[in-house]
A protein has these predicted regions:
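Mid-to-C-terminal alpha-helical segments outside catalytic/metal-binding sites
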Residues: 1-44, 241-246, 252-308
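Active-site neighborhood of phospho(di)ester-bond hydrolases with catalytic His/Asp-centered motifs
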Residues: 2-5, 47-48, 79-81, 111, ...
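Short, flexible/disordered intra-domain loops and linkers
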Residues: 16-24, 54-60, 87-93, 147-156, ...
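Divalent metal-dependent hydrolysis catalytic cores, especially in the metallo-beta-lactamase
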Residues: 20, 24-55, 76-83, 108-115
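Alpha-helical scaffolding within the catalytic cores
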Residues: 26-34, 57-68, 93-98, 157-162, ...
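Active-site-proximal loop/turn and secondary-structure-junction residues that shape catalytic pockets
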Residues: 51, 82-86, 116, 144-146, ...
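Active-site gating/metal-coordination segments in enzymes
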Residues: 56-155
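Catalytic pocket-lining loop regions of alpha/beta-barrel enzymes
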Residues: 109, 121-247
Length: 308
């Protein structure tokens, strides 16, 4: 069983930036996402709405996400998404009814948030206050800088993230992005996909050790890169943090059958004995099930649109 905690899919095509094609090479249609499940041995996934305008001009409504889940309740669960600037850019805006509405309809958490604001921004802090109030899981994308990129920006040591981990202990933070996973190492290569051995002192390792409310969303090329750059470190990392790591893909385009993804990587590590069946099961589905409120595999496999 593999449950993917990081999926994006659109019902229809739309505006595409210059140089891109909306044919499952620039975000996936639902059909394309389901094909990726089949190609890469994934049973079910968590849809994350593309809602923050910082990154892409083609955005989604929550209604579109609900429609996708209603069409394929055996294949998808979903998060709600929101933007700290919603509700009139008010740092005292009440997100409660919005959150309650989507929880009542079946949403399991919040994300993926990619607003290009710092953690300490008053609008961000207000939104986190409300997520904490409802004790929800929260997927976030880290950025190294304001402007020219999307994602919550933080310094190399992730000091902003550490502050909110302390301040909001009832949020289960799902860390993601190249900037997040590059900081698994203690060196200064913290953008894109650094190669070579993982040096001691990486902020991500320290924060995973210290804070019970931080989890690692290992999706995208960045998560895979973090696990393939140093095989000896990876053996330790997967075993040591076996209760805190989450399988995901973040397929934003077509990935051919047979190409190495996190799915194939974990299958290979199980086959060669690098990880145990227990570690494999925890990372591939069990940790996600617990964080999304399911006690058993059967519950996770049930249809996900029962409240729409």
């Amino acid at each position: 069983m593999k449950f993917d905690v990081h999926c994006h899919a659109f019902l229809t095509t739309g505006f595409v930036p210059k140089g891109k094609r909306m044919d499952d090479n620039f975000f996936l249609t639902v059909k394309g996402q389901l094909e990726m499940f089949d190609y890469h041995n994934i049973d079910k996934g968590l849809l994350l709405p593309v809602l923050n305008h910082d990154g892409f001009p083609y955005l989604q409504t929550m209604r579109e996400i609900e429609d996708i889940v209603a069409l394929h309740p055996d294949k998808f669960l979903y998060f709600m998404n929101m933007d700290p600037r919603m509700f009139m850019n008010d740092p005292k805006a009440d997100f409660s009814r919005y959150i309650e509405y989507h929880l009542e309809r079946g949403a399991r958490g919040v994300g993926e948030l990619s607003a290009n604001l710092p953690w300490e921004h008053p609008l961000m802090d207000n939104m986190l206050y409300h997520i904490n109030k409802y004790k929800l899981p929260f997927t976030f994308h880290i950025s190294p800088t304001p402007y020219y990129v999307y994602g919550i920006y933080d310094d190399y040591n992730l000091s902003g993230l550490e502050r909110v981990l302390n301040k909001y202990p009832d949020i289960r933070f799902f860390g993601h992005s190249a900037e997040f996973w590059s900081r698994i190492s203690g060196d200064t290569q913290y953008r894109d996909y650094p190669k070579g051995p993982v040096e001691p002192g990486g902020p991500v390792v320290r924060l995973l050790e210290t804070y019970p409310n931080l989890y690692g969303d290992m999706s995208a090329g960045s998560g895979l890169n973090a696990l393939t750059r140093d095989p000896e470190f990876t053996k330790w990392f997967l075993d040591h943090f076996q209760d805190k790591l989450l399988f995901g893909t973040d397929f934003c385009g077509y990935v051919p059958k047979g190409k190495m993804t996190l799915s194939e990587f974990l299958d290979d590590r199980l086959a060669d004995g690098s990880i145990s069946q227990q570690v494999y099961d925890k990372v591939c589905w069990n940790n996600a099930a617990k964080q999304l409120g399911f006690e058993t595999l059967d519950q996770l496999q049930q249809k996900g649109a029962d409240r729409l």
